[in-house]
């Protein structure tokens, strides 16, 4: 029987499935961080249980840490408690931890692939919704809750119901200036933020194949933003080239054997998907969100939609509420919207490719006077090291940006990088919900190049018409 890639991955990891019951999956890799793991470890202690597979669990610090200092003693309140608890729990259980004093530390969804912890064919979980990022490697990766974190620590398994399969095909090649972020925002704009609910999505088509691994990670990262359980890209030579030589990737004959297996990880030609979505790559423009969910997005060459022209009453009401919060009027030209802050970072767009794209825009330019702050936050210590080797940090600083240490930073209001009330931000992150970047902050999701251009020109501009250096 023909199978989709998702069905192959799921079936290969079923440990036990009784009639009428939810299957139990084996978990190959468990990634943990300081926010969703403390209660899970407490649960183990109370029950008198041990971590079952310490060699399959890896920790890092990212969500609540400061990107300004590397000293845990400089952290305050809950952030300090969370970081200290993670360090204590990892040490007590023999779990490998990439802490703030190591260059390998970083955002969990940047660190994992960098270290070769993310490999095709695996099941990967983490107490974070954007675990879907790792699906770019042909791994079944999804976020879990804290009680499930405890369950995986104790058993290395998880109960999981089968999802439906969705294929999203992006046909043809994108035009110059169009990035992975624009592709995935266009997908979300077409499907709406609930279009993938109940599905695992496989991204395919020439435009997806043309992407680097960094770009594929950006696309899979935001699968969750249209309701999907996980996102997938079938592994290919681009995948293998990225992984070869990584610290935790197979070596020697094990590598050769692994690649032979990984080449089988693709949907069968006659596999049946429950849902299919098709986009033409040539029609995708640089994207900017105008509302308060990622599905409220349009091309930079368009105007803010008019809720009065929306036939569906729920969509209309949502748009009216979003515009009231975001402070925009219907029919406003997207290129006439000034910004107060710019954030380049997050698990969506903080890899070296993203920083190079931003630097190409910012080189030889200065931050616009109306822009209060520009934060550039690398996704890991290794990304930071590479960027500094290439001189990108100097470009950012000379342009008037702040060059920070690795961490989740202003993606979410959980640390000391936040928007002020009613400030408007061009952000390379993945969510533009109300208050996501700080109380009453206004977030517009864009690509790194678009964010950098907004910083330099003080408003959203069409990156296709900006000279790159």
Swiss-Prot record:
Cofactor(s) this protein cannot do without: [4Fe-4S] cluster
SUPFAM superfamilies per the UniProt record, alphabetical: Aconitase iron-sulfur domain
Binding residue positions for [4Fe-4S] cluster: 347, 408, 411
Transmembrane domains' residue ranges: none
Gene3D superfamilies referenced in this protein's UniProt entry, alphabetically: Aconitase, domain 3
Cofactor binding annotation: Binds 1 [4Fe-4S] cluster per subunit.
Keyword Metal-binding among record annotations: yes
Protein name: 3-isopropylmalate dehydratase large subunit
Species per Swiss-Prot/TrEMBL record: Actinobacillus pleuropneumoniae serotype 7 (strain AP76)
């Amino acid at each position: 029987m023909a199978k989709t890639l998702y069905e192959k991955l799921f079936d290969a990891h079923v440990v036990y499935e009784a009639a009428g019951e939810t299957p139990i999956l084996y978990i190959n890799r468990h990634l943990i961080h300081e926010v969703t793991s403390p209660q899970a470890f407490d649960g183990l202690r109370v029950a008198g249980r041990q971590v079952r597979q310490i060699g399959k669990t890896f920790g890092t610090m990212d969500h609540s840490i400061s990107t300004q200092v590397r000293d845990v003693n400089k952290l305050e309140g809950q952030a300090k408690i969370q970081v200290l608890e993670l360090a204590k729990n990892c040490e007590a259980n023999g779990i490998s931890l990439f802490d703030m004093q190591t260059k390998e530390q970083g955002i969990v969804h940047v660190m994992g692939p960098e270290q070769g912890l993310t490999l095709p064919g695996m099941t990967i979980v983490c107490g974070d919704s954007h675990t879907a990022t790792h699906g770019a490697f042909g791994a079944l990766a999804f976020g879990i809750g804290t009680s499930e974190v405890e369950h995986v620590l104790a058993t290395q398994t998880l109960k999981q119901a089968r999802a439906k399969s969705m294929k999203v095909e992006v046909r043809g090649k994108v035009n110059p200036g169009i990035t992975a972020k624009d592709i995935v925002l266009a997908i979300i704009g077409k499907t709406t933020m609930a279009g993938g609910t109940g599905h695992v999505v496989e991204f395919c088509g020439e435009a997806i194949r043309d992407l680097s691994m960094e770009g594929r990670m950006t696309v899979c990262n935001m699968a969750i933003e249209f309701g999907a359980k996980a996102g997938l890209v079938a592994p290919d030579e681009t995948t293998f080239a990225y992984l070869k030589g990584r610290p935790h990737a197979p070596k020697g004959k094990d590598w050769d054997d692994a690649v032979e297996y990984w080449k089988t990880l693709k949907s069968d030609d006659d596999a049946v998907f429950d849902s299919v979505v098709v986009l033409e790559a040539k029609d995708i423009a640089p994207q900017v969100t105008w509302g308060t969910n990622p599905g409220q997005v349009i091309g930079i060459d368009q105007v803010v939609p008019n809720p009065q022209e929306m036939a569906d009453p729920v969509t209309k009401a949502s748009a009216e509420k979003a515009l009231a919060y975001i402070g925009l009027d219907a029919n406003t030209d997207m290129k006439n919207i000034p910004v107060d802050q710019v954030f380049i970072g997050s698990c969506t767009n903080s890899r070296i490719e993203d920083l190079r794209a931003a630097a190409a825009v910012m080189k030889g330019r200065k931050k616009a006077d109306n822009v209060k702050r520009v934060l550039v936050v690398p996704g890991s210590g290794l990304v930071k090291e590479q960027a500094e080797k290439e001189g990108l940090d100097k470009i950012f600083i000379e342009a008037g940006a702040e060059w920070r240490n690795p961490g989740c930073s202003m993606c979410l209001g959980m640390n000391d990088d936040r928007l002020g009330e009613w400030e408007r931000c061009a952000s390379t992150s993945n969510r533009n919900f109300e208050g996501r970047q700080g109380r009453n902050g206004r977030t517009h999701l864009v690509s790194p190049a678009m964010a950098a251009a907004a910083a330099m020109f003080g408003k959203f501009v069409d990156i296709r018409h900006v000279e790159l250096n």
